[in-house]
Structure formats: C-alpha cells, structure tokens
Swiss-Prot record:
Residues 661-673 have a biased composition (Low complexity). It comes from Rhodobacter capsulatus (strain ATCC BAA-309 / NBRC 16581 / SB1003). Heterodimer of SbcC and SbcD. InterPro entries: P-loop_NTPase, Rad50/SbcC_AAA. This is Nuclease SbcCD subunit C. ATP binds at residues 37-44. Belongs to the SMC family. SbcC subfamily. Pfam families: AAA_23, SbcC_Walker_B. The lineage of its organism: Bacteria, Pseudomonadati, Pseudomonadota, Alphaproteobacteria, Rhodobacterales.
C-alpha cells in the first residue's frame, strides 16, 4: 500500500486546513523527505492525523494508561486514550483524511471526524464519525468505526499494530529493543512481529492435552457405571420365553379348529343371504320389465315419426324464408322513402353553402390594407417593450446593488463599533483581574500538583480499604479451614465403616457363587432352547396332519364336482345340436312362405290367367292357395323358429356354465393335491427335527429323558422339570446379583469418599496459601497507605504558598480546582478577547474606507439607470396609443387568422354540401332497385311455402299422425329413441341375468348344506376362540417384555464393547497430546513462544545487519543466549559487546537498522510503499548522518518513499524536500511543503 495524501483541520496544533499531496511535486519525485519544525510545533500531529483517518487511533494515545482521565472543555472528563483528545482546544470540529492506494491497485479515501454538540466550542463531544470511500466514484464502502477499521485492514493488508511497525516507526517503539531485558524484549518482539500466535498455540496445546486427559478419565468412569445381567439371569429370561412360546404353540391347533368351524357357519349364512338377495334381484328386474309398457309405445311412435322429419323441416324452412322475404320488401320500401327525403334536404343545404362562401371571400379581401398597417405597428411596439423592460431591469439592479453596498458599509461601521466596545471591555476586565495574573501564569504546574494531591488522598483511602478487606478475608479463610478439617474427619469415619460392610458382603457372596456357577444357567438355557425346538417340531407335525386331512376332503369334493360338471356339459352339447338342427330345418320353408306373401308375388298372381304361361316359371297351370292359410302357416313357422333359437341360446348358456364349473372343480382338485404334498413334506420335516434334537437333549447332564419319537406327554413333563430347575437357579442368581450390587455400591461410596478426602486435603492446602497471601496483601496495603500519606503531606506543603495567594488554605477542599480553573479561565478569556478585538479593528479599517467609496459610485449609477428607464417607457406608450383603434385592439395575426379560418371553413362547407347531394342521389337510385328485387323474392317464397305444406300434409296422412303429435315428438331431445331402446334392452337383460344368478346361488347353497354344519353354535365357538386369542395376546406381550429385557442387556454389552474401543482411542490420543505438550505446550504459552521468538529474532537480526552494513559497517548484531542481543565490533576482531556500551549515535544507528528490519517483517507479505520514521537524529555526527541519509535514500530503489521527522538543522540541510511545520503563536501551527521547484 502507498500513502497518496494526508489532510486535516484542528488536529492538535494544526488548526488551519492542510493537505500534503505525495502525488505532486516536489514530494512526488522525492525518495526521502523531512518533516521539520521546532519541538512542540506539531510534526507528530501529521502522523496522528494519518493514523486517525486509517485506524481511529494514534501512537501518542496508546502510550499512556487508558484509565487516566483528562478534562474536556465541556466540563467532563474523557479517557487519555480517547481519540477525541486530539481535537484542538477551542475548536468545535476537527477532521483527518488519508488518500491511499490499496493492495488491489485502486485508490481509497479514509476519513475521521470529531465534533461537539451544535457545533459550539462549549458543546459536549459527540461520537466520532468515520468513513471509507472509493476515490474514483465516491462510493462509500463503510461508515461505522469497526467496519472502517476492518475494511482498511483488508485493503492494506495491515492491522493497526502492523501499520505502526511497517509504515510508521513512532518514537521509542524500536529503541526499546536495546533497552529491554530478555523478558521485556520477548514481549516487545511478540508485539511488533505478531509472534503471539505461537503463545496461543502453546496454550491451546496445553488445554487440548488437559481436555484429552479429562475425556479419558470420563470414559473410564462411564465404564464403571454400567450394570449387566449375569448368565443365570439371562438363562432365566430365556426359559420363561420358551415356556410361553410352547404354550402358544399348543393353543394354535385348537384355535385353527375353532376358526375352521366358525368359517363353515359363516359360509352357510353367506350362501343363504346370497340366495335371498338373488331372488329379490329377480323380482325387482321383473317388476322393472313390467313397468316399461309406456316406454315401448313411445318408442313405436318415435320410429313411425322418423321418416317425417325431412318434410317437417322443409315446411318450417319455407315458412321462415317467406317471413324473411316479406320483411325485406317492407324494409326496402321504407329505405326508398327515406332516400327521397334526404335528397331534398341535401339540395337545400348545397344552395345555402354556396351563398355563405361568396360572402366570406369578399370580407377577407376588404381587411387586407388594415392588417398590413397593424402588423407594422405591432413590430415597433414589441421592440419598444423590450427596450423599456431592459431599462427597468438595469435600474432595479443598480438600485439593489447600491442598497447592498450601503448595507455592507453600515455593517462594517457597526462591526468597528462592536470591536471598539469589546477592546474597552477586555481592557477593563484585565484591570479587574490584574491581581490574578500570576495565578494564571503558574496554573499548569499548580493544576498538576492539585491532581497529584487528590490522587495521593485517594490512594491512601484505597490502601486503608484494601487493608481492612484483607483482614476480613483472613478471618473468613480461617473459619473455612476449620470447617474443611471437620468435614475431612467425618468422611474418614464413613470410609472405615464402608470398608467393614464390604468385607462382610464378600464373605456372604463366596459360597453362593461356588454353588451356582454361571455355566449352570447357560446349560439350562441351552436345554430350554432344545425343548423349544422339540415343541416346534411337535406342533408342526400336528398342523401337517390337520392340513393333510383337510386337503384329502377338498380333493374328494373337487372330483365329485368335476364329474357332475362334465355330465352337465355333455347334456348341454346334445341340447344345442338338436336346437340348431331344428333351426336349419325351419329356415327354408319360412323363407318360401315370406316370398309367397310379398307384394311382388301378390301382384304377379293377379296378372296370371288360365291357359297363359307364367312369366316367371312358364307353367300353364296356376293353383292359387288361399292367402289367409298361407299367412297362418308362415306365422306358425316363424314361432317354431323363434322357439328353436331360444332353446339353442339356453343350451349355449348351460354349456358355458358347465364348462366353467368343470374348470373350477379341476383347479380345486389340483390345489388339493398340492396341499396334500406340502402337508406330507411338513410332517416328514417335523419328524426329522425331533430326531435331530432329541439325542442332543438327552446328552445334557441336567436334561430329563425323552423318547426317540414325538411324545407330547413326555415333552410336557420335561418342560415342567426344566421350569423348576430354572426357578431355583433364578432365585440363587437374584440373591448373588443383589449381593454384588450392594458390594459395588459400597465400593462406589468408598471411591466417592476417597475423592472427597483428596478434595479436603487440597482445600486445606489452598486455604493455607490464601491465608499467607492475604497476610502479605494486608502488609502491602498498610505500606501503600503510609507511602500515600507521606506523598499527600509533601504536596500539601508545596501547594501552601500558591493557595495562600489565591485565598485558599486546604488543598483538598471541595471545588478548589474548579474555582481556581474558573479564575484562570477568566484571565485567559480576557486576554484572548483583547487580542481578538485589536485584530478585528486592524482588519476593519481598510474595509470600511473601501465600502464608503463603493457606496457613492453605486448611488450615481442607480440614478442614471432610473432616468433611462423612464424615457423608454414614454416611447412605448406612444406606439400603443396609435395601435389601439386598429382591429379593435386585437393582435393582427390572430384577427387575420380568424377571418381566414372563416373563409376556408365556408369553402369546405360548400364542397361537403355538393358531395352530400351526389351521395343522396345515388342512395335514392339504389333504394328503388332494392325495393323491386325484394318484392320478386317475396312472391317466389310464398309459392315454395305452399308446396312444402302440401308435402307435409300428405306425409302425415300416410303415417296416420297429426301435426301436433309430430311436433311434440320432434321437440323431444336428440337420442331419445336410442335411450328408450337401450333402457328396454337393459331391463330384458337384467331379468335374464337375475334368473341365471338365482339358479347358481341355489346350487351353491345346496352344496354347502350337503357338506353339513358343525354341531356347536357360532356364539359358543366365538367365545372359545376369543378366550384363546386373549390368552395368546397376553403371552405374546409377556414374551415381548422378556425379549426386550434381553435385548436391552445385549445392547448394553454392545455399548460397553464400543466404549472399550473409545477408551483405547482416547488413551492413544492422550499419549500423542502429552508428547506434543511436552515439546511445546505450557499453561502460560511461554515454551513455544520462546522458540518462535528466538527464530524470529534471528531473522530480524539478519535483516537489521543488512541495513547496519550501510549505516555503520563497524558493527554487526547477533543473538546471544535466549533473546539477549549483542554487537560484534569488527574493528576489534569481531569482539562481542553489550548494546548498552554503544554511544548515543551508534545506538541510534543500530536502532534505525532494527526499525527498518521490523518494517520489512511486520506486514505479512504486504509491501508498504511509504515509510515514516519519527525518531531524532540529533545524536549523529556529520559522517554518520550522511550514512543514515544515504541508507534511507537507497530505500527508494526498493519502491519506498521515506519521511523522517526531525528538528535537527543539519538533517534539514541535507534533505532538499521538506514539510515545514511552524509555530504561529496561541498554540497554532501551520505547515508548508518546500523543495525544488516550489
């Protein structure tokens, strides 16, 4: 980063606004420049302004204690480290601004501002305002104190401390290296190079080690807190689960039988319900079929009306066309009449428009000469008005200027009078305060002595309070020590009692554990598992036998149903063959009979004559049967054919039903065979399971004897025997567990007491140390009190003469400092007022003389301008009087435009009237043509309408239907016939389907009744089944609870296994951290910090030696033991010397080399293009000064610009470019940039 400019106002002694621009000559081309001035002139204030603008702090504010207070002009005290303390006394506002280039290459402006309330000198200090903006567009990036500091640090890459050691090397910051001892040098090195990070790392390593140790101890404590079930308890739980599982299995077969019986009852009841429902459905379908008579009649009428739709539509359309033609003829006649009237009106309007156009044209020509004269006068009047307005404006401006000048003259005269009065008042006030002038002159020292006296009094009171507090703490610590000793004695007695109780429990536990080892419980659990397997094998065999019997019954029933279905299928096929044969036999005769009864045959028979050949077959004989007998024969043949078709359809339905029943029966038979096979397989598996498990059970020592084949009685006896053994073992294990629990609790209580005893001892030791410390504090407090009292008495003695002159006798009197300050302030105010009045009078004299001359000149100019304005107004009025009679005073252009508009409007009206007349003539001709055409169309439509009505009447007569009936049928919604037809078909199909369903349901009911129902009623069966299921549910809950207890124990065991892994991992991690802690860790962080500081000091010495080679080649720095520094004297054979043995000039050069090295190391890789050194060069001789300047100038080749603050004249003479700070009196200073070209 690079500093581009520094600006400010009212920063300490720099009262006037100032700006130092490093981008313009001569500073822009100067690699080295000096900031010069007398001591106290304000050289360092420039650097304060730079730091305030960038970071809101300044080096001089950080030097003192932040708890110190300083008085403010507003009557309050502020911290000595408050940045507002930089604000100049007597100033209402002050600011500092820095323009700099950031790491990104862009330019930014940082600003700091302090102000007082209401911008008054006596106002209360307000909160500091800070801002950061981008220079190129003025965009504000931050406007809050913390945000500005963070943004500046991000843009420059430097924190405030890094800025102070990289860009600004303030007074005393680097010479402290040579003055400090090893401990102080470590602190300074950590401060200026940022190696405090390593101290933090060392502390973190120590804390992490302690955390790992605590985590390891916590895991060990967690492992000791868990309690597990022993093997006997787990075996007992397993036995109870097996017993309840066996009982559940035994009840399963009975539940299956009861469920099957209830299912048979439900199937019979369902079959009866379905027969009843099918009968009800058939009755409902037949009733709906009977109700459809009116619908059938309506459908017949709709079918007869269908051919009449077209004639009806044609007649309606003809009537509509006739109505439309008549309406068109009437409208055409009316239009012809209206067109004739419009033609007459348009002819009259055309005549009137022609007359008006002639009249307006003549009037327009008559006004021509008048308009020309009026236009000439209008131009002259406009020119005269402009000239008159300009003259009036000039007169008003000169009058206002003269009045302003006269007011300024009066203001200066009044100011002169006020300044004279102020000078007289100040002189009188100084005369009144002449006796207090010495007090004002000695006030700074007197104020410091008073402050020191107050501080001594406060220190004495604080020391006395501290001594009393130490005595009170000593008494409290003694009482706490006595209480701790009593608690320790109680815990020791309790620990002895617990040790005796633990020994007694151990004696009672030993014989029980010997008689009931954990292996016994495990053996019983294994026997229980084996018996459970035998129980499952026995249950599986029983269930397989039951399933096999059921499958055999199902197979027999399926075979019977299949045989019956095949017989029904054969009979249905025979019926279908007979019906189809009968249909085929009746088809030919019926077709011949229909042909004989047709209209064509009847017409041909009427043309036959005896002896003439038949035109069809050529026969000469023509027997003619009676038509009535022939019709009767055809009707009988048609009825027989319909009956045959019905029989064929019934046979097809029966065939389909028989085939479905046969397929269903065959599927049931296949499923029954598969069920028999699975039952056989399951029975064989059950016998094999019994055979595999029984030898293993018999081989166990505690197991009862069992036969080689499944035997329910023997198995039940074995389970009873096992239950008794497990009950006895569970009781013994419960007693062992209780004793172990009591023993563990006793050990836990003893451990708690041991920790308490350790805590008691630690408390006693801590209290002893605190008592010693408290006694020491009391002695120190008494010593401080004595010292403060002596300092107070000495200051009171020193203050006595000055207080006596001021009429005061007690330096600790309330309000003394305020009274003395008020007197001193009054003297200072009077002196300041006198000086200000004299300065004001000197400045006002030439201003007042010039104001009087300006007033006379302005008055003469105003009078001349007023006369010119009056002349111009007269000329303008004469022209207006000449123009007023013409055109009634109206503007010429407006009057001419109005008459021209009237002429043009008359011409347009004449043209429009002619066009309207032509349009009306054409409209009349078109209306007459339309009237003739519509009359012809109406005649033709009437003829067509009569023909359509005649066709419709003939069609209605042929269909035996009236026009009203046809209209009602046609008005029905579209699709009515189809809906009626579909509804009737659905009713007929519903009756057929209901009859078929009723027959099927009756067949199903008969089959179920043939199988027979259980003897026991459904209510009794349901009650028995509910009791069995409730018992099974209870056993399932008990099994679940017991299983959950086993699962919890297993989970605890698994958790403990994981805890062991965690404990081992924690131990390994603790070992690692202990090794790291041994290397670099420490509670205070010193271990690693010293290592880092030693390395950093080596690098710092290396950088410093490079600069020292240019500044003073005789010496070379080196690090001695730990962090101490020595110099090697090359002129003395590289002899090592202490830094304190260096002369003043040599010491400064070494300090300067260290400062430059620190500036290289302090920026975390950020290059600082500007460097300020605030350190005196007065200790250097001419040669050393030249070397120092040459070394600083070489930094320009590295891209740096170096500024040196110094009041040494030799330094100023050797540096051409300077920022000179000069005192101006009254605590004010000003600055100026000096150099080549300025």
């Amino acid at each position: 980063m690079r500093i581009l400019s520094i600006s400010g106002q009212n920063i300490a002694s720099l009262a006037a606004p100032f700006r130092i621009d490093f981008t313009t000559a001569p500073l822009a081309g100067a690699g080295l420049f000096a900031i010069t001035g007398e001591t106290g002139a304000g050289k360092s204030s420039i650097l304060d302004a730079m730091c305030l603008a960038l970071y809101g702090d300044a080096p001089r504010l950080s030097a003192g204690a932040r708890s110190d207070k300083v008085p403010d002009a507003a009557g309050e005290e502020i911290s000595a480290a408050d940045s507002r303390a930089i604000l100049r006394r007597g100033a209402a506002t002050g600011w500092a601004e820095v323009r700099f280039a950031g790491r990104d290459g862009l330019e930014y402006i940082a600003r700091w501002q302090a102000r007082r309330a209401r911008d008054k000198v006596e106002g209360k200090l307000q909160t500091v305002a800070r801002s950061l903006a981008r220079a190129e567009d003025g965009q504000v990036l931050a406007a809050q104190t913390q945000a500005v500091s963070e943004q500046v640090a991000a843009l420059t890459g430097l924190s405030y401390e890094e800025f102070r050691r990289t860009v600004l090397l303030a007074q005393g910051d680097f010479d402290a290296f040579l003055r400090a001892d090893t401990g102080e040098r470590a602190t300074l090195l950590e401060k200026v190079t940022g190696t405090g990070l390593y101290r933090a790392v060392s502390i973190r390593v120590y804390e992490r080690t302690e955390m790992a140790r605590a985590e390891h101890a916590q895991l060990l404590a967690r492992a000791a807190e868990h309690r597990l079930l022993d093997d006997a308890a787990r075996a007992a739980l397993t036995e109870e689960i097996a017993a309840r599982t066996a009982a559940t299995a035994a009840a399963t077969a009975e539940r299956a039988g009861l469920s099957e019986a209830l299912a048979r009852h439900r199937r019979h009841a369902e079959a009866v319900r379905q027969v009843q429902a099918a009968a009800a459905a058939l009755a409902g379908a037949e009733a709906l079929q009977a109700e459809a008579g009116p619908a059938r009649a309506q459908l017949d009428r709709l079918e007869r009306a269908a051919p009449l739709h077209l004639p009806w539509q044609a007649a309606a359309e003809a009537r509509a066309r006739l109505d439309a033609a008549r309406s068109g003829a009437e409208a055409a006649a009316a239009s012809r009449s209206l067109a004739a009237q419009a033609l007459a009106t348009r002819a009259d309007a055309a005549a009137r428009a022609t007359a008006a156009g002639t009249e307006t044209e003549e009037a327009f020509k008559a006004f021509g000469r008048i308009w020309d004269r009026a236009a000439a006068l209008d131009a002259q009047i406009a020119t005269a008005a402009t000239e008159a307005e300009a003259a009036r404006t000039r007169a008003a401006e000169t009058a206002r200027a003269a009045a302003g000048i006269r007011r300024a003259e009066a203001d200066l005269a009044a100011a002169e009078t006020r300044a004279q009065q102020a000078r007289q008042a100040a002189e009188a006030r100084l005369a009144e305060l002449a006796a207090q002038a010495p007090l004002a002159d000695d006030w700074p020292q007197l104020r410091r002595d008073l402050a020191d006296h107050r501080a001594a009094c406060a220190a004495q009171a604080a020391a006395a309070t501290a001594a009393q507090a130490a005595q009170d703490r000593a008494q409290a610590l003694a009482q706490e020590a006595r209480a701790a000793a009593a608690a320790e004695a109680r815990d020791q007695a309790a620990d002895s009692a617990l040790a005796k109780a633990a020994a007694a429990l151990q004696q009672a536990l030993a014989p029980l554990e010997a008689a009931h080892p954990p292996a016994r419980t495990a053996d019983l659990a294994r026997i229980e598992t084996d018996l459970a397997e035998l129980t499952r094998a026995l249950r599986d065999g029983a269930e397989a036998a039951a399933l096999g019997a059921a499958a055999q019954r199902a197979a027999t029933a399926a075979a019977t149903e299949a045989a019956l279905a095949r017989a029904q299928e054969s009979a249905a096929k025979q019926d279908l063959d007979r019906a189809e044969t009968q249909i085929a036999a009746l088809t030919a005769p019926l077709e011949q009979a229909d042909l004989a009864l047709s209209d064509a045959a009847r017409s041909l028979r009427a043309q036959l004559s005896a002896g003439s050949p038949c035109p069809v077959c050529g026969a000469l004989e023509h027997p003619t049967p009676a038509e009535a007998g022939l019709a009767h024969l055809a009707e009988r043949l048609r009825a027989d054919q319909a009956a045959a078709r019905g029989a064929a359809q019934a046979a097809r339905d029966a065939l389909t039903a028989a085939q479905g029943a046969r397929a269903t029966a065959e599927a049931r038979g296949t499923q029954a065979a598969e069920d028999q096979r699975r039952a056989q397989t399951r029975a064989e598996a059950a016998r094999a399971a019994w055979g595999d498990t029984q030898p293993r059970v018999s081989a166990r020592p505690l197991a009862p004897a069992l036969p080689g084949t499944p035997d329910p009685t023997a198995l039940a006896a074995a389970q009873d025997r096992l239950c008794a053994l497990q009950t006895a073992e569970a009781a013994a294990q419960a007693e062992i567990s209780a004793l172990r629990t009591r023993l563990t609790e006793a050990e836990r209580d003893r451990e708690r007491l041991r920790r308490a005893l350790l805590a008691h001892r630690g408390t006693r030791e801590r209290l002893a140390v605190q008592q010693a410390e408290t006694a020491q504090e009391a002695a120190l407090a008494e010593a401080r009190r004595t010292e403060a009292a002596a300092r107070r008495d000495g200051l009171a003695l020193a203050l006595a003469p000055a207080l006596a002159r001021a009429g005061e006798d007690d330096p600790a009197a309330p309000g003394l400092a305020e009274r003395l300050a008020a007197t001193v302030s009054a003297v200072g105010a009077a002196r300041t007022g006198l000086q200000a009045a004299q300065e004001a009078l000197s400045a006002l004299a030439p201003q007042l003389a010039a104001a009087r001359r300006d007033s006379e000149t302005a008055t003469a100019q105003a009078q001349s301008a007023a006369q010119a304005a009056r002349d111009r107004d007269g000329a303008w009025a004469a022209l207006r009087a000449e123009r007023a009679p013409l055109l009634d005073g109206q503007p010429t252009a407006l009057h001419r435009s109005r008459f021209n508009d009237q002429r043009l409007a008359a011409q347009r009206a004449q043209q429009a009237a002619a066009a309207d007349l032509a349009t009306a003539q054409a409209a009349l001709a078109a209306a007459e043509a339309r009237a003739a055409e519509t009359a012809r169309a109406a005649s033709e439509a009437a003829t067509a309408q009569r023909a359509a009505e005649a066709d419709l009447a003939a069609a209605l007569e042929a269909a035996a239907m009236s026009a009203a009936e046809l209209a009602a049928l046609i008005a029905l919604p579209p699709g009515t016939a189809e809906r009626l037809r579909a509804d009737l078909r659905g009713r007929d199909d519903a009756v057929t389907a209901a009859r078929s369903a009723l027959g099927a349901r009756k067949t199903d009911l008969q089959e179920i009744e043939d199988q027979g129902n259980p003897a026991e009623d459904p209510e009794a069966l349901s009650a028995r089944l509910a009791a069995l299921e409730a018992e099974a549910e209870r056993r399932a809950q008990e099994i679940g609870q017991l299983s959950a207890e086993l699962a919890r124990d297993a989970a605890t065991r698994a958790a403990l296994a994981g805890l062991a892994v965690e404990t081992e991992a924690a131990r390994a991690e603790l070992e690692v951290w202990e090794a790291v802690n041994k290397a670099i860790g420490a509670r205070s962080g010193d271990r690693f910090a010293r290592i880092a500081q030693a390395i950093t000091l080596d690098v710092l010495v290396e950088h410093a030696n490079r600069h020292l080679a240019d500044l003073n080649p005789r010496y070379r720095l080196r690090r001695a033991a730990e962090l101490s520094l020595q110099v090697e004297d090359r002129d003395m054979g590289d002899t090592a010397r202490a830094t304190r043995s260096l002369s003043g000039g040599e010491r400064f050069l070494v300090s300067l080399a260290l400062a430059l090295a620190l500036s290289q190391m302090g920026g975390k890789g950020t290059f600082a293009g500007t460097l300020f050194i605030d350190e005196g060069f007065g200790a250097l001789d001419a040669g050393s000064l030249d070397l120092a300047i040459d070394a600083l100038e070489t930094l320009q080749s590295q891209g740096r610009q170096v500024g040196v603050i110094s009041h040494v004249e030799a330094m100023q003479a050797r540096i051409a470019t300077r920022i000179a700070v000069r005192k101006e009196g009254g605590g004010r200073s000003s600055l100026r940039v000096e150099g080549p070209g300025v």
